[in-house]
Curated annotation (Swiss-Prot):
The keyword RNA-binding applies. NCBIfam families: rplV_bact. It comes from the Eukaryota. This is Large ribosomal subunit protein uL22c. Disulfide bonds: none annotated.
Length: 137
């Protein structure tokens, strides 16, 4: 299945982050739909361990937007943010009398998509002009 190319969006993907998916979703649900600057303040003040890798991903997505697409950081909004479960690393903890207990280390994949809101206004104007030209024929 081919992925649709969307203009005005950039993303950052973090794979195999050693954290369970529900713990990361708790933070992701708070930042979805917010502006970039508001997200930075929220993540700096939240008391969860998931905030650090998510903050790195948000900064990485903003750097992608600035460097690759020349977007302004003030107009960026987190349009999509999703957390998927990754592989589970299985280990054995040695115990007394030659026994062992299994230990599961869950991982997750986090994807942050930033959208430029100024591009939306341009896109609406552009497609409205294009539609009018089509109707005239």
């Amino acid at each position: 299945m081919k992925k649709k190319k969307t203009y005005g969006e950039v993303y950052a993907l973090g794979q195999y982050i050693s954290m369970s998916a529900p713990k990361a979703r708790r933070v992701i649900d708070q930042i979805r739909g917010r502006s970039y600057e508001e997200t930075l303040m929220l993540l700096a003040l939240m008391p969860y361990r998931a905030c650090d890798p998510i903050l790195k991903l948000v900064n990485s997505a903003a750097a992608n937007a600035r460097h690759n697409m020349s977007f302004n950081e003030a107009t960026l909004v987190i349009s999509k943010a999703e957390v998927n479960e990754g592989t589970t690393v299985k280990k054995l903890k040695p115990r007394a009398r030659g026994r062992s207990y299994p230990i599961r280390r869950p991982t997750c994949h986090i994807r942050i998509v930033l959208q430029d809101t100024s591009f939306d206004e341009f896109e609406e104007d552009f497609f409205s002009l294009k539609k009018d030209a089509w109707e005239k024929k």
